[in-house]
A protein has these predicted regions:
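Outer-membrane beta-barrel proteins
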Residues: 1-156
Length: 156
């Protein structure tokens, strides 16, 4: 749900495989975002849930962005609640021949660093995305992971 005022709320879900009890992730989120010329900002809250598992957590985030020509640059700062890890993320994106291209670099405090490289295209009202992700753990609390993900999304 997105309102003209800039307020938004939603639910996001996916399958996961963190341990034997975690097989689904359901996130509830809301916030306020605005664009003013080439600048944008987004202040929001996310509640991450793993029904039947453990590891639920919440965070507040502040995202800042700027468009420079055909390139979008962004930085997001996430503040974990109740001992959840903080996160800083830098991103860049552009469009080339109708295909969106992006890269994201991030660092979760005391957990690990990650990179995501993606390509996306809208076809018939569906957003198709192909991404490669790499997570390098800082300690034994997490494990290194690489993945290739294909996503089909539809916004209402």
């Amino acid at each position: 749900l997105v309102l003209d005022s800039g307020l938004y709320a939603g639910v996001w879900g996916s399958n996961v495989d963190f341990d034997a009890n975690d097989n689904i992730e359901l996130d509830y989120y809301g916030g306020y975002s605005r664009e003013t010329g080439a600048l944008s900002y987004d202040l929001g809250y996310i509640d991450y849930n793993y029904p039947g598992g453990s590891g639920d957590f919440e965070e507040w985030y502040l995202g800042l962005g700027i468009t420079a020509g055909t390139v979008d640059l962004g930085a997001t700062f996430s503040f974990g609640l109740d001992n959840a890890n903080d996160n800083i993320e830098l991103s860049a994106g552009t469009e080339l021949s109708g295909i969106g291209l992006g890269i994201t670099l991030g660092d979760y405090d005391n957990s690990g660093k990650y990179t995501v490289v993606s390509a996306s295209k809208e076809i018939g009202g569906l957003e198709l995305s192909l991404a490669w992700s790499d997570f390098d753990a800082d300690s034994g609390n997490s494990s290194d992971e690489d993945a290739v993900t294909f996503t089909v999304a539809k916004s209402f």
